[in-house]
Regions:
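C-terminal regulatory/oligomerization modules of transcriptional regulators
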Residues: 81-154, 253-291
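Basic, amphipathic "hinge/linker" alpha-helix immediately C-terminal to the N-terminal HTH DNA-binding motif
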Residues: 3, 54-75, 223-241
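Short, Lys/Arg-enriched N-terminal segment that forms or immediately precedes the first helix
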Residues: 1, 143-167
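Short, solvent-exposed amphipathic helices
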Residues: 65-86, 236-254, 258
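Short amphipathic alpha-helical interaction segments
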Residues: 30-43, 197-212
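N-terminal helix-turn-helix DNA-binding core of bacterial DNA-binding proteins
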Residues: 1-31, 97, 115, 161-202
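N-terminal alpha-helical interaction blocks
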Residues: 6-7, 26, 37-38, 43-46, ...
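Beta-hairpin "wing" of winged helix-turn-helix
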Residues: 43-57, 61, 213-223
């Protein structure tokens, strides 16, 4: 559900305080047909609730399940402020990352950092090890990569929704699945093909896009054969992948996560929490102010 560019853009707009149908149309440039479809799915999947306003238009408000996506959007904000939006076309002002973040408890501007709950060490991408979780043997083929298999979007929708780098990666189910697989250590075309159950033509297209976006780089290692490795820009997306996993494990398959991560420095199963980079306190959604 959250691996869709329009869905992510709508949710981010709601987090920023815009909740009405007309707000989404005017600020996102989304067609009414696509907007109606995505809002219906967000309500059906209990991420949003349609709240009637006496004498006015209804509002779409975040449910507990929707509010729990705030750490993922925090990770997205962090990536965008460090790496830019990667503008392909003009990105509307409403979607530009706000430049500063304040922790209202200590009153300081700060950069958040993701720490291990057990050892309090800042989590680094290659200090983790993926392991089969309790639900590994029961998931449908092709979902071992932590994300559900992509449905076909129309080319028009995809083009309109994916205006910049982050949405082109996270907002496309196959691209986000490839990203997650790369963090698992997969590097070869055949490994991606087997793990994701993706057709060779589609895989070639997606790898080509991730190369063009600077998320992956190709390296020849045996004649004409290539392996695909994450760039620094791609590695920096690790907190986003972690938060997508965390949300899915909590709300989609509680107690039956298909994949778990072990934090190698402390040898515990990884549980991460965001902390203030200034006072080191654990952050909560209501204690963060973007401006």
């Amino acid at each position: 559900m959250i691996g869709d560019a329009w869905t992510l853009r709508i949710l981010r707009t709601v987090f920023r305080g815009r909740r009405r149908y007309s707000d989404f149309v005017s600020e996102l440039g989304i067609s009414r047909a696509v907007l109606t479809d995505r809002l219906g799915k967000l309500v059906a999947n209990e991420l949003l609730i349609r709240h009637a306003i006496e004498g006015g238009h209804p509002e779409y408000r975040l449910t507990e399940r929707g509010l729990d996506l705030w750490p993922m959007f925090l990770a997205m904000w962090l990536w965008e402020t460090e790496w830019g939006t990667g503008v392909m076309d003009d990105v509307p002002p409403v979607e530009q990352p706000r430049p500063m973040l304040m922790h209202t408890v200590c009153g300081h501007k700060m950069r958040p950092q993701l720490e291990c709950q057990h050892c309090s060490v800042v989590i680094q991408p290659f200090d983790t090890q993926a392991e089969a979780g309790p639900g590994y043997l029961h998931i449908e083929p092709g979902t071992q990569s932590m994300f559900r298999r992509a449905s076909q979007n129309t080319l028009a929708e995809a083009s309109a929704a994916q205006a910049h780098t982050l949405m082109r990666v996270i907002g496309d189910r196959w691209n986000s699945a490839l990203l997650a697989a790369a963090f698992k250590g997969l590097r070869l075309f055949s490994e991606f093909e087997k793990d994701l159950r993706i057709g060779p033509n589609q895989l070639s297209d997606r790898l080509g896009e991730l190369l063009k976006l600077g998320i992956l780089r190709a390296r020849s290692y045996s004649g004409a054969r290539q392996e695909y490795r994450l760039t620094r820009k791609g590695v920096a997306m690790f907190p986003i992948v972690l938060e997508m996993m965390r949300w899915g494990d909590k709300w989609l398959w509680p107690a039956t996560a298909p994949i778990v991560l072990r934090h190698k420095p402390c040898d515990h199963l990884l549980v991460g929490h965001w902390h203030c980079g200034h006072c080191k306190m654990q952050l909560s959604r209501t204690e963060i102010h973007l401006f």
